[in-house]
Amino acid sequence: MPIVRLKENEPFEAALRRFKRTIEKTGLLTELRSREFYEKPTAERKRKHAAAVKRHYKRIRSQQLPPRLY
């Protein structure tokens, strides 16, 4: 677990912001949410495959030229 030490004369809100930033960088919250409930291996594969397809189509869409506006 990430540790954040309070510096001298540092407000609690600033330390809390630093803690939240370190948690976000380590990906702890996303892992916690994914482990909150059991997901069958087939459901996990299906979800990951759907995300890959979505990324693929998004990449294709961003590489296409915009349609001509007449």
From Swiss-Prot:
Biased composition (Basic residues): 45-61
Keyword 4Fe-4S: no
Disulfide bonds: none
Domain of life: Bacteria
GO biological process: translation
Keywords: Ribonucleoprotein, Ribosomal protein
Cellular component terms per the entry's GO annotation: ribonucleoprotein complex; ribosome
Signal peptide: none
Entry's Gene Ontology molecular function annotations: structural constituent of ribosome
Family of this protein: Belongs to the bacterial ribosomal protein bS21 family.
PANTHER family: MITOCHONDRIAL 28S RIBOSOMAL PROTEIN S21, SMALL RIBOSOMAL SUBUNIT PROTEIN BS21
Protein name as catalogued: Small ribosomal subunit protein bS21
Origin species: Bordetella pertussis (strain Tohama I / ATCC BAA-589 / NCTC 13251)
Source taxonomy: Bacteria, Pseudomonadati, Pseudomonadota, Betaproteobacteria, Burkholderiales
